[in-house]
Amino acid sequence: MSIKSRIRTIPHYPHEGIMFRDITTLLKDPAGLRSTIDGIVQRYQTEKIDKVVGIESRGFIIAAPVAYALSAGFVPVRKQGKLPAETIGCDYQLEYGYDKVEIHVDAIDKGDRVLLIDDLIATGGTMEAAIKLVQEAGGEVIECCFVIDLPDIGGSRRLRQQGHRLFSLCSFED
């Protein structure tokens, strides 16, 4: 089954010149959703994964069922101020300015083997911040997983150059 063929492209959204990759068409298709989750689970089913970290917000949709299938815990990475208990945070650069993501201080145990999941990698800034949070909490990042890689934007290349393992189910090149 082609996951890529089930992803809708919306030109000039949210800004002129952007080709937005919309996974809602993949998620609404029962076979597409199953193929997405199963494809990720199959890759990691022989690994010992303690926690699956999902990045707000579309990463949650993929990460939670993967965590369930791998008998691992699920940890959300949220934007600043969205988690109710004590957090640790990491700033990351946007095109114009900065943003911050957080996890609860007790979300990752020292030595946890962690899989990070997001729907898409473009610049890699959010994933880089999530990696730093997991490491600061004492976790070991096993791999960063994405449904979509946009390699022309350079995020996957940058994270690989930093020594991180990455996996994506499909890629869209311009």
From Swiss-Prot:
What is this enzyme's class at the first EC digit? transferase
Listed A to Z, the keywords are:
Cytoplasm, Glycosyltransferase, Purine salvage, Transferase
Gene Ontology biological process terms from the UniProt entry: adenine salvage; AMP salvage; purine ribonucleoside salvage
Annotated pathway:
Purine metabolism; AMP biosynthesis via salvage pathway; AMP from adenine: step 1/1
The family line of this record is: Belongs to the purine/pyrimidine phosphoribosyltransferase family.
Protein name (database record): Adenine phosphoribosyltransferase
- The answer to whether UniProt assigns keyword Glycosyltransferase to this entry is yes
NCBIfam families documented for this protein: apt (TIGR01090), PRK02304.1-3 (NF002634), PRK02304.1-5 (NF002636)
Q: How does it assemble?
A: Homodimer.
- InterPro entries registered for this protein in UniProt: Ade_phspho_trans (IPR005764), Adenine_PRTase (IPR050120), PRibTrfase_dom (IPR000836), PRTase-like (IPR029057)
Q: CDD domains in the record, alphabetically?
A: PRTases_typeI
Task: Specify the domain of life of the species encoding this protein.
Answer: Bacteria
Instruction: Show the catalytic activity.
Output: AMP + diphosphate = 5-phospho-alpha-D-ribose 1-diphosphate + adenine
Name the source organism: Nitrosomonas europaea (strain ATCC 19718 / CIP 103999 / KCTC 2705 / NBRC 14298)
